[in-house]
């Protein structure tokens, strides 16, 4: 779990793992959703997290001048991701979708908003605690990306309400 005291490379690795955990959760939720709209929404959210993972990987590799490209690719496939964004255990999220059937897009969006808001709060806290300037910049960028996700999710909720 991130603390804000990591060096830049470690912060990127930890952030990557959390993004991967969230991506995997959204993919599982898509498979278990009770409606095609919820499946589509979770599938789209999973792709958002893939974009975050690619961003983090590109930063990591640019710092190392692409020296570890093959190693990072292997790491990304093998790395277990027990935590989702915000440090939420993936198993807790999985229990949430087991406890009730996600029957519509609104349910899917509400779960996603909770995850993204928790993630935003974590990255904000980490940016405030970061000892390395470079790590602070990364945490602030991740926080901004989570803000964008929350804005997009809220816009999607408004569109559903209009239907």
Named regions from a protein language model:
Residues 1-163:
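Non-heme di-metal
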């Amino acid at each position: 779990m991130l603390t804000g005291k990591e060096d830049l490379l470690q912060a990127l690795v930890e952030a990557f793992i959390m993004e991967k955990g969230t991506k995997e959760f959204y993919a599982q939720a898509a498979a278990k959703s009770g409606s095609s709209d919820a499946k589509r929404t979770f599938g789209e959210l999973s792709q958002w997290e893939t974009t975050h993972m690619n961003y983090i990987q590109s930063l990591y590799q640019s710092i190392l001048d692409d020296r570890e490209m093959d190693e990072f690719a292997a790491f990304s496939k093998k790395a277990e991701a027990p935590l989702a964004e915000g440090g939420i255990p993936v198993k807790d999220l999985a229990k949430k979708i087991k406890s009730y059937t996600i029957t519509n897009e609104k349910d899917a969006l509400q779960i996603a908003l909770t995850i993204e808001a928790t993630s935003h709060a974590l990255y904000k806290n980490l940016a405030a605690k970061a000892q390395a300037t470079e790590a602070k910049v990364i945490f602030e960028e991740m926080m901004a990306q989570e803000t964008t996700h929350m804005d997009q999710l809220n816009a999607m909720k408004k569109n559903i309400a209009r239907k």
